[in-house]
């Protein structure tokens, strides 16, 4: 169903209306492999139709993400920031550009990106660009006036400084070997309530010892674990619904696993999840982030980024340093491309020392 470009009198309300429609469309087109409760997704779709403020849209998108539509915030945050920019600019300026959606052009979007993405990482800036391109491409296809004509923006954002350049090889934040040992000790030392102690310690240790992604760990099921010859083989459902297996020495987690499985029997577990809250639902990535950050602070190891993904980088760095095998890193982490794994060669101390010693050779 197509809609007039400007149904309402206020251009900021019209912009919000289109953002809501686009986000609803994205909710139906994003990967739903992590969705466990379809009813929650239906609720979100219905609420997106009714949302009449940016705060309501933000709330619904968070709910959709928690329901398993993990990529929705990649679009929601930039677009709601653009709505904020458009609304503020309309109030404090007398420029006619903000009196109609038809006046939105590349210049305005470049100004928005310049103001709102300063200090953000290149990857985040690219997400802003992708979200804007997605929105205006959607509007191009979905708007139609009473004469069945559409207003076409044809936004490309090809010449935006700092957004189109190559991402380069930014070194990921990680813990070195000694710091990882300290972090592991802190997992056991930090105080936790009896109900979550075994669960949280088990969850975080599995991530440390395998390097799996946080959402992969949160979706693990008991049937994914096989014990043989003192090792657990863990079947992981990764990106693109691709499966891979990792191995973990049983002694690292065995006592915690037994303790948690006893506690877990008290909960109405849904979908055979290994890790769940007291309602039986999956834990959120936000909760996991807070728990990891709490342990990092306790250990005195605070970094720029303190979530579970840093533990993944730490595992990969240590794996490459000890084995010097990029294929092994790629397979263990589930990277689709070897180039993604190549970043960890920058942490190869042996190679760096060899480079530094060339001036001492005859």
Swiss-Prot record:
| Domain of life of the native organism | Bacteria
Q: What happens when the gene is disrupted?
A: Deletion blocks difH recombination. Deletion mutant shows impaired chromosome segregation, slight growth defect, UV and ciprofloxacin susceptibility, resistance to oxidative stress and inability to colonize mice.
Q: Where is the Tyr recombinase domain?
A: 170-357
Q: What keyword terms does UniProt attach to this protein?
A: Cell cycle, Cell division, Chromosome partition, Cytoplasm, DNA integration, DNA recombination, DNA-binding
Which GO terms are recorded in the biological process aspect for this UniProt protein? Answer: cell division; chromosome segregation; DNA recombination
GO CC, alphabetical: cytoplasm
What are the protein's GO molecular function terms?
DNA binding; site-specific recombinase activity; tyrosine-based site-specific recombinase activity
Query: Where found, per UniProt?
Result: Cytoplasm
**Chief localization class?**
cytoplasm
Q: Which Pfam families match?
A: Phage_int_SAM_6 (PF18644), Phage_integrase (PF00589)
* Domain (Core-binding (CB)) ranges: 43-140
Note the InterPro entries from the entry. Answer: CB (IPR044068), DNA_brk_join_enz (IPR011010), Integrase-like_cat_sf (IPR013762), Integrase_catalytic (IPR002104), Tyrosine_recombinase_XerCD (IPR050090), Xer_N (IPR041308), XerH (IPR033683)
Catalytic residues (positions):
213, 239, 309, 312, 335, 344
| Activity regulation note | FtsK is required for recombination.
User: Its function?
Assistant: Site-specific tyrosine recombinase, which acts by catalyzing the cutting and rejoining of the recombining DNA molecules. Involved in chromosome segregation. May contribute to chromosome decatenation.
What family classification does the UniProt entry report for this protein? Belongs to the 'phage' integrase family. XerH subfamily.
Write the protein's name.
Tyrosine recombinase XerH
* Organism the protein comes from: Helicobacter pylori (strain ATCC 700392 / 26695) (Campylobacter pylori)
């Amino acid at each position: 169903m197509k809609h007039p470009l400007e149904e309402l009198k206020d251009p900021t309300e019209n912009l919000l209306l289109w953002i809501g429609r686009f986000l609803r469309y994205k909710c139906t087109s994003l990967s739903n492999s992590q969705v466990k409760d379809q009813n929650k997704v239906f609720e979100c779709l219905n609420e997106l139709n009714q949302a009449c403020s940016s705060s309501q849209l933000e709330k619904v998108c968070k709910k959709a993400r928690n329901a398993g539509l993990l990529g929705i915030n990649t679009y929601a945050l930039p677009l709601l920031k653009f709505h904020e920019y458009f609304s503020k600019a309309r109030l404090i300026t007398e420029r006619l550009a903000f009196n109609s959606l038809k006046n939105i052009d590349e210049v305005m979007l470049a100004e928005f990106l310049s103001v709102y993405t300063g200090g953000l990482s290149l990857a985040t800036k690219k997400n802003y660009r992708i979200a804007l391109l997605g929105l205006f491409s959607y509007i191009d296809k979905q708007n139609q006036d009473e004469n069945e004509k559409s207003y076409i923006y044809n936004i490309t954002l090809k010449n935006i400084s700092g957004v189109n350049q190559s991402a380069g090889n930014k070194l990921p934040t990680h813990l070195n070997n000694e710091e990882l040992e300290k972090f592991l000790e802190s997992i056991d030392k930090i105080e936790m309530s009896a109900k979550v102690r075994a669960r949280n310690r088990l969850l975080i240790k599995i991530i440390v010892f395998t390097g799996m992604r946080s959402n992969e760990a949160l979706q693990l099921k008991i049937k994914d674990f096989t014990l043989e010859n003192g090792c657990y083989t863990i079947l992981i459902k990764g990106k693109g619904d691709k499966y891979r297996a990792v191995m973990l020495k049983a002694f690292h987690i065995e006592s915690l696993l037994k303790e948690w499985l006893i506690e877990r029997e008290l909960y109405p577990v849904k979908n055979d999840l290994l890790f769940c809250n007291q309602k039986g639902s999956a834990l959120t990535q936000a909760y996991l982030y807070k728990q990891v950050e709490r342990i990092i602070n306790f250990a005195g190891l605070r970094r720029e980024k303190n979530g579970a993904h840093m533990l993944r980088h730490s595992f990969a760095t240590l794996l490459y340093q000890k084995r010097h095998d990029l294929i092994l890193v790629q397979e263990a982490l589930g990277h689709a491309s070897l180039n993604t794994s190549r970043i960890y060669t920058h942490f190869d101390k042996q190679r760096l020392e060899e480079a530094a010693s060339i001036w001492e050779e005859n």
